[in-house]
Amino acid sequence: MIYPTQYDVIVIGGGHAGTEACLAAARMGCKTLLLTHNIETLGQMSCNPAIGGIGKSHLVKEIDALGGAMALATDKGGIQFRILNSRKGPAVRATRAQADRALYKAAVREILENQPNLDIFQQAADDLVVEGERVTGVTTQMGVTFKAPTVVLTAGTFLGGKIHIGMENHSGGRAGDPPSIALASRLRELPLRVDRLKTGTPPRIDARSVNFDGLEKQWGEEKTPVMSYMGSLADHPEQTCCWITHTNAQTHDFIRSGFDRSPMFTGVIEGVGPRYCPSIEDKVNRFADKDSHQIFIEPEGLKTHELYPNGISTSLPFDVQMAFVRSIKGFENAHITRPGYAIEYDFFDPRDLKYSFETKHIEGLFFAGQINGTTGYEEAGAQGLLAGLNAALKAQGKEAWCPRRDEAYIGVLADDLISMGTREPYRMFTSRAEYRLLLREDNADMRLTEKGRELGLVDDARWQAFCKKREAIELETQRMRTTWIQPNSAEANALAAKMPAELAREYSLLDLLKRPELTYDDLGSLKGEAVSDPQVAEQVEINTKYAGYINRQTDDIERMRQHENTVIPVEFDYMSVEGLSNELKQKLSEARPETLSRASRIPGVTPAAVSLILIYLKKRGLLKNKAALA
């Protein structure tokens, strides 16, 4: 049957990508349907119970700045918050939250169920309705067809999913959930490049069987941060600690003894695993000279005894898992509640996508999350939001939008995937961003919330809070610029102990704030009243101390933007460009970059090659300055 309601956007999958996608489309006023195989697993954390980390928290903050749910749910479910790289510069500082799985999932579901314009339906999607070269709907397992001009597919690890524990394997989307076999087969019929990837998870351990005596405790920050710009400490549940232990030589011997029954080493698993989150057997094999590897013991929640031993992801046989786990300090009598496993799944080459995350070959079909070759909740959520908002824009007949690399980590993520593709699960790092001093986690709202409001993603409450904060930053900066400290004054004497020399002349508070030895806390209330909002104070301090570097990066960006919007026609013949190597001709013909700027980021494409293409475009009268993402 055909369902009577006509939707604008249909989202398949209720994980981290799917939830952000459907919420974004609904916030923008589109009639949206979320199809999930099980409503009880909406927002489920399939692997580690944590949100954020280096590079990842930047994505979470950007999702939040655009009105998304991930940061809000993290504040509701976070049971430990830490600031990583706290002693380094603001560009690489990152917030990481340990989360209670149940509380996080409940927070996501509450947001979904209270979102206007959003319907949820429990049923697996088996087929896409494609008419000509455009998608027009989705057919479910029981034969119900839902119609919509745009569909966002966020299938996670479910497409052709296969779970491995030792030499045993079975079909599954994750432990306890069936895979999407029919939909995977249907997608393989489409003109899209497909391959296999692999990820894994560690065995879970009953805390009652662990000896915590002698294990190092790891507590959160004394001044607990919030993840969302709209969050507050009052949102946080009870805070708890984690622990640290290590593998040892005996652990490694047990692991090596299972190599002959490892699906990874025997060739049973064909998919490539994540480079930056390797299994314990991979670490022992690759780093044979290391005597031990660190393990973070993380609680799964406040009302469960299960622990997540971060660092020992494995697909070794269960008897080997038991042996090596019990060789680890604190785990001598450990009871494993769930075995570790690896899962292989289909992913599709992201180079077959536009920057809106719409497929190049099937109009109206968008991909987001692990289907695009990424790993991580945060990467999935960022893609989901971008795909969802662009599906909504397409349904509304509007031009697509994608932030540039100098505007957001979401833009870096999209550009990396679509211009270069990936052969292994892609994760975000701050090192991937050329302009990371501008793309800090602390200023994501200053960078993106205004655009989010323009797109219809940001509600009145968030917009008012943003405007109030922005005005407060401007006012406090101006106050400090016009407040002066005289030499030998009481204020100058109060600073003397922190300065290498006495003031020789009059200085404004803003000038003094530029000095590395002084902070906003030292100066804010020195003369007048300091701001009470720590986020405002942080922005004033960072913008002042790093002004020179920020201005330099801004100038670099302006130079790069000269060719940012120089369009390369879709039918452009690279083979005709004299001077380009055959290798570059082949790469460019395959990648089909939409602009000169994006062509320049393809590996091997030099500035000289970009110049040759530009000259060719000028000679043929093909120069255009508006990049059409839609």
Curated annotation (Swiss-Prot):
Gene Ontology annotations of biological process type: tRNA methylation; tRNA wobble uridine modification
Main localization of the protein described in the UniProt heading: cytoplasm
Binding, NAD(+): 273-287
Compartments where located: Cytoplasm
Domain of life according to the entry: Bacteria
Xref: InterPro entries: FAD/NAD-bd_sf, GIDA_C_N, MnmG, MnmG-rel, MnmG-rel_CS, MnmG_C, MnmG_C_subdom, MnmG_C_subdom_sf
GO CC annotation terms, alphabetical: cytosol
One Pfam family of this chain: GIDA_C_1st
Cofactor: FAD
UniProt xrefs under SMART domains: GIDA_assoc_3 (SM01228)
Alphabetical keyword list: Cytoplasm, FAD, Flavoprotein, NAD, tRNA processing
Gene3D superfamilies noted in UniProt: FAD/NAD(P)-binding domain, GidA associated domain, C-terminal subdomain, tRNA uridine 5-carboxymethylaminomethyl modification enzyme MnmG/GidA
UniProt GO molecular function: flavin adenine dinucleotide binding
Binding site for FAD: 13-18
Reported function: NAD-binding protein involved in the addition of a carboxymethylaminomethyl (cmnm) group at the wobble position (U34) of certain tRNAs, forming tRNA-cmnm(5)s(2)U34.
Family membership noted in the UniProt record: Belongs to the MnmG family.
Subunit structure, as described in the record: Homodimer. Heterotetramer of two MnmE and two MnmG subunits.
Official protein name in the record: tRNA uridine 5-carboxymethylaminomethyl modification enzyme MnmG
Gene designation per UniProt: mnmG
